[in-house]
Regions:
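GH16 jelly-roll
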Residues: 18-250
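Bacterial Sec-dependent N-terminal signal peptides
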Residues: 1-19
Length: 250
C-alpha cells in the first residue's frame, strides 16, 4: 500500500512542478483536437536542403502522409519514400508571423520517435529572423536522452550552452517545460530541471534572449548531428504532440 501512496505522491508532484508558476495565465495554446492543423496558428515549411542548413536528408511536405491530426494528437511522420529528389519525407511547422512572444512558461506534452538517423525537435527561433535559437527538446538516433540548448552570437561569434537529461523512455509522453524570465531560461521534463541558462542583465551578451521568439516542430532524417547512416527498417516513425501551451506572467 505504501508504494501506491508513493506513486500517487510522485505523480501529483510531477503535475504540480510541470504547471506554470502562480500569476501566469494562458495566452496561446493548441490542443490539436480539430480535424486538421489550425493554419491561423501554424505555417508549413516545405522543401529540402539547402533550406535548413544541417544537411538533412528529408523533404518536408504538408501532405496527410507526413502530418495529420487524429485522436486529439498532432502526428509528424517521417517516411522512407522517393519524393521530389529525396529518399525521405517528413514535416515541419512553425508559428512564424502567426505568434511570437518574449518571456513566459512553455508547456508541451510530447512523445518522441527514436531511431538511427532520426532527429525530432521542439524549438524556437528569434522573431527578428536572426540565427539566435532556443532548442527546447532535441533527440538524436537511438539515445534515450533529450538535449536542451541555447544558441547565440556575442560579437558575431557563435556560442552555445546546453544540458541533457538522464536516461528515460523518450517514446512515451512526457511534459516538457521552459520557464523563461528576464533572469533565466530554465528547462525541465516532468518537473525535473536539467538545464538553466543565466540571462540576467544580458550577461555574456545574451541580449538576444530578451526579444521575441516563435515556435517550431519537426522530425528531421539525417544531418550533421545524427549523421547519415539511416535505419530504413524503422519507417514510418513519428512525433506525437498532445498539446502546447504558452503562459505569461501578469
Amino acid at each position: 500500500m505504501k508504494y501506491i501512496f508513493l506513486f500517487l505522491f510522485l505523480s501529483l508532484y510531477t503535475i504540480i512542478k510541470s504547471k506554470p508558476p502562480e500569476g501566469y495565465n494562458l495566452v496561446w495554446s493548441d490542443e490539436f483536437d480539430d480535424a486538421s492543423l489550425d493554419t491561423s496558428k501554424w505555417v508549413y515549411n516545405t522543401g529540402a536542403e539547402p533550406n535548413w542548413g544541417n544537411n538533412e536528408l528529408q523533404y518536408y511536405t504538408k501532405r496527410q502522409e507526413n502530418i495529420y491530426l487524429a485522436s486529439g494528437l498532432l502526428h509528424i511522420r517521417a517516411r522512407h519514400e522517393s519524393y521530389e529528389g529525396s529518399e525521405y519525407t517528413s514535416a515541419r511547422i512553425t508559428t512564424r508571423k502567426k505568434f511570437d512572444f518574449k518571456y513566459g512558461f512553455i508547456e508541451a506534452k510530447i512523445a518522441l520517435p527514436r531511431g538511427k538517423g532520426i532527429w525530432p525537435a521542439f524549438w524556437m527561433l528569434a522573431a527578428n529572423d536572426k540565427a539566435d535559437e532556443i532548442d527546447i527538446i532535441e533527440a538524436v538516433n537511438t539515445e534515450n536522452v533529450v538535449y536542451s540548448t541555447c544558441h547565440w552570437y556575442p560579437n558575431g561569434e557563435y556560442t552555445h550552452e546546453s544540458g541533457q537529461t538522464d536516461t528515460f523512455d523518450i517514446t512515451q509522453f512526457h511534459i516538457y517545460t521552459v520557464l523563461w524570465t528576464e533572469e533565466m531560461i530554465q528547462f525541465a521534463i516532468d518537473g525535473n530541471e536539467h538545464f538553466t541558462l543565466n540571462i540576467k542583465n544580458s550577461v555574456r551578451q545574451t541580449n538576444s534572449f530578451h526579444g521575441n521568439f516563435y515556435l517550431l516542430l519537426n522530425v528531421a532524417v539525417g544531418g550533421n548531428w545524427p549523421g547519415f547512416e539511416i535505419d530504413d527498417n524503422q519507417f514510418p516513425t513519428e512525433m506525437q504532440v498532445d498539446y502546447i501551451r504558452i503562459y505569461k506572467n501578469n
